[in-house]
């Protein structure tokens, strides 16, 4: 559902942020959590740049295999010039996986896999935005082949 998070969900998100920030993984898993959360909870008050960056991050991670660090670099590239950011139709359902389910997974590999599943679930809900996101990233020369992916 596209309604804002309740206090329990917000608390779970904050706890998951603490987990990913303390993770110590150089791949920077935290970026994927930010992107999934923003896209899943976007609403009328969400700025186009925020949703664009979140969807770009999810596309690069889920479809192209980018690490959180690579997504972070892509966000920096996108932010280098001012522009009008695209607007997206917000799907009613934003993915079946929720942050509380991710946090319920045991810390470590299981939770990291749950984060990946959450990202895939949210990105799948925005499948109609894929062409717009891919074209935007190509415009900025942010493309899988640039990072050793085909």
Model-predicted segments: where are they?
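Intrinsically disordered, low-complexity linkers and terminal regions
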Residues: 1-150
